[in-house]
Amino acid sequence: MTEIFGKLHRSSNSENTNQASPSTIQSHSTQPVLSNDHSTKVNDYEGKEGASSNGYDPVFMSDRMKMRYNEITAQLHKEQSLKEDKESGSNSSESNGITPMGTYSEKPKLLQSRTPPSSCYIRHDTVVPKDKNGQHAFGRLYVRLHQGRDLNVKSVNAQPYAVITFEKTQVMVPPPFKDIDGGIPISIPSKNRPLAGSASGSSSGLHSELMLADVRCPHWDFETVFDVTKMKSQMVVSVYDKYEDDKFLGSVKITPIFLHEYVQEAWYKLEPLDLTKSLEGEIKVETIYEHIEHVRYGPEDFTALRLIGKGTFGQVYLVRKNDTNRIYAMKKISKKLIVRKKEVTHTLGERNILVRTSLDESPFIVGLKFSFQTASDLYLITDYMSGGELFWHLQHEGRFPEQRAKFYIAELVLALEHLHKHDIIYRDLKPENILLDADGHIALCDFGLSKANLSANATTNTFCGTTEYLAPEVLLEDKGYTKQVDFWSLGVLVFEMCCGWSPFYAPDVQQMYRNIAFGKVRFPKGVLSSEGRSFVRGLLNRNPNHRLGAVADTTELKEHPFFADINWDLLSKKKVQPPFKPNVQNDLDVSNFDKEFTNTNVKNINIVSNVDPANASTPLSNTIQDRFRGFTFVNKSIDEQFQNLGLQENEETDNLHACRTTTHSSVNSINSHGNPRTVDANDPVADTVFGETFEA
């Protein structure tokens, strides 16, 4: 990565930049050469004149440490002043605006807070490449997280780390390496030596302050690169303290400037999630955008690292993109299988919906980065959500506290709101299709059973979904069903999250159908508040016309007393701190996924093509291959994407009325955690058309 920074620096010429009044942004059209050196520490000056090479005597440390502290501070200010004068003279008389090799654009100093001067500048002769539609072509965003200062940490053992999020792709920045032998030597007083009022106690306290000052100003010097697939994207850098159980230290939202080889360098003030409160601390971030021509990717451009999931028609891999080393999830789908099962339309529909939701972004829906195909397979490349499936966490914890479940349900409501607003019915809401990112926010995935172009009161008839979450009208109504089926599934999900089992589960599928259509459910004792129970009853009303959400869709759900403490505006901007943060060590962490998959050896797996001899010997005909025309996702407008696809979105001709159902594999394992099915005898009854859902 450092080579890229240097390459961009050498490839462009700059003009002198006039520095404005102190602010928070420093941008250039050329790349200053960055050093991997950490900024000057206090101990760097211990060997200078006036410093003892033998450490110090703790008995006489108090006055000496104070004197040394003042000397160091004065020296830092002096060197910084000389450096600025030198750079100013160099830039004005000898330089063409390019920072000489081996120097710094700025070398931050410990114990000194200085906001760099601001300048926003780009050469007038810079050519900004555009595509044939007049839009800026896509490229790569290089990011360097330099350092922080004045972070709100209270312990010298603090381990500040960061999560950088861009277009839903997340990168973990580990805590900075601590040199155990570095810094001013620590003197540990003897147990029998008095501390109160002694010079030793005073020096120890001052030394602790210096150590804390060092910890509050971490130096990450971390570099990474992101694929840019849409303009106007923002980058979020969130800072946490691992030592204090992932305490949130603040975040910044940065809007990069997508001009070729444009450098943006700034100090950004950390902001709390609740803007009515204040936070200390700043971080220094640098970004460079690099334009690339339109590129068509294929499976050979990715390397499989782990298997993280497996389905009826293919597998999901953790992959690394070879040119940027960025980590993604790759869904590989066998063309032969979906043709044989008559699922071509559903599969292409999934891709279309991912394109639509990616271009009109929802923060709670997984983002599509690329899609492409070979003669035998289809490939969907999406953001990797390292927090794992919600199902995995529910399986391991049995059930969630109501507040945690409410947070997930609220974000799901916003995800469904986005889909319904765009006339999309989801139809497969279940824990396996809900992912968590590294911060603990949800992302809805797997749109294989979703249907687009379904207006508010329109109906559809396809019998599909996961058995335990099917709405009764899917089983009983010949006239079809509406988007209300998503709210029924949401009610089942709330019950399962809070109670620990599915309300309609039975070992026999036919019995499960009867339970959904006519069975009664009782809440367990001591679970769910009265508002929570009211919310579930409203969603599990068997009459879709009386169900919560039937009149005003998700607006009704958001106005329910169950969500009285939810600030929907802050939640939609991810400004509400999740109640649970997954344990994620790095970008390659798969510990939140099922080991049945992640322990699979992928070294011999060929993601480029099917290794099945049958597939190799009997290729698909040109007529069948033509059905997949337009699957590849490139940098085009959404209208062009759908025009290139040779079928209408609202067609469901492959498997109309054919049952595609799966039993929910989590039920037995969740019940095995020992959640007793004790019910509340005082729970009131809910009125429905098809029969009472809840038993008295």
UniProtKB/Swiss-Prot annotation:
Function: Protein kinase that is part of growth control pathway which is at least partially redundant with the cAMP pathway. Required for trehalase activation.
GO biological process, any: intracellular signal transduction
Residues at which ATP binds: 308-316, 331
Domain C2, residue spans: 122-272
CDD domains: STKc_Sck1_like
SMART domains named in the record: C2, S_TK_X, S_TKc
Record's compositionally biased regions (Polar residues): 11-37
Comp. bias (Basic and acidic residues): 38-49, 77-88
Cellular-component GO terms for this entry: cytosol
This protein's name: Serine/threonine-protein kinase sck1
Catalytic activity annotation: L-seryl-[protein] + ATP = O-phospho-L-seryl-[protein] + ADP + H(+); L-threonyl-[protein] + ATP = O-phospho-L-threonyl-[protein] + ADP + H(+)
SS bonds (residue pairs): none
Phosphoserine found at: 665
Name of the coding gene: sck1
One term of GO molecular function: protein serine kinase activity
